[in-house]
């Protein structure tokens, strides 16, 4: 089940725009059915896969941020198949930052989710310390 909305895609694009401005790269937003959100392009060539997670709170609201295990697996599979690194791009109300998919593997896993989606709303997630997500 795809739970991504038009609002989600707009928020992801805004996060990618900030990333592009900071690093002088291009981020191509991939189709919603693709396993990750975007591909970073450097000097006209693919350089990395990006999964975007937009939060509606400030970065200091919680000590950790969730990275879905299946998203990290997809990023690592793409990295293994292509050689392009996979990364998570987190955006909060007050800041944004990135962390590599490889680094996420070192953190504890919990089961977390949204009760408003019923049983389909829960999944295993890595508990990534917010302080480890760097600009």
Tell what function each PLM region has.
Residues 32-36, 94-95:
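Short acidic/glycine-enriched loop/turn segments that link adjacent beta-strands
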């Amino acid at each position: 089940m795809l739970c991504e909305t038009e609002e989600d895609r707009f928020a992801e694009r805004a996060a990618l725009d900030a990333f592009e401005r900071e690093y002088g790269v291009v981020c191509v937003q991939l189709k919603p059915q693709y396993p990750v959100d975007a591909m970073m392009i450097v000097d006209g060539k693919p350089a990395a896969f990006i999964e975007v997670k937009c939060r509606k709170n400030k970065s200091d609201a919680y000590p950790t941020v969730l990275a879905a295990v299946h998203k990290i697996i997809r990023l690592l599979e793409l990295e293994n198949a292509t050689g392009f690194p996979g990364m998570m791009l987190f955006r909060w109300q007050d800041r944004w930052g990135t962390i590599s998919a490889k680094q996420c593997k070192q953190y504890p896993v919990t089961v977390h989710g949204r009760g408003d989606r019923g049983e389909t709303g829960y999944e295993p997630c890595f508990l990534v310390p917010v302080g480890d997500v760097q600009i």
